[in-house]
Amino acid sequence: MQTLFTKSRKRDIVLALFLTVFIICLAVIITVFFKQLYYFDIDYLKIAESTGLSREVIQKNYDVLIQYQSIFYQGSLNLPDFVMSNTGRIHFEEVKRVFEMIQITFVVTGIISAVM
């Protein structure tokens, strides 16, 4: 009887860890890909006024950047209204890899949690 309790307890702990990672990844994904939050911030933080760029230009370039971060997008990052340095390009490639790992971890932990 004690062996069953121990196996069950270990399973519960592992499931809790997978669910925790799943929820953290979900929170990151929602925050990054929820464009309306940034659209709100353009006005709320007065980004257009402080940069001298129109809301439309900021939003269009942000949309391109967010699309680039998706695991499903395999092209290069080309912002329509901004020139990017080589170090800037490297930075965004590294950030994309981080977000891809978060998206993969989200899917894997979700599947594992569902079948446990």
Task: Write out the residue ranges for each language-model feature.
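Residues that form generic nucleotide/phosphate-binding pockets
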Residues: 30, 64, 68, 95
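Alpha-helical transmembrane signal-anchor/signal-peptide segments
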Residues: 32-51
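Short extracytoplasmic
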Residues: 52-71
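Individual transmembrane alpha-helix segments
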Residues: 71-109
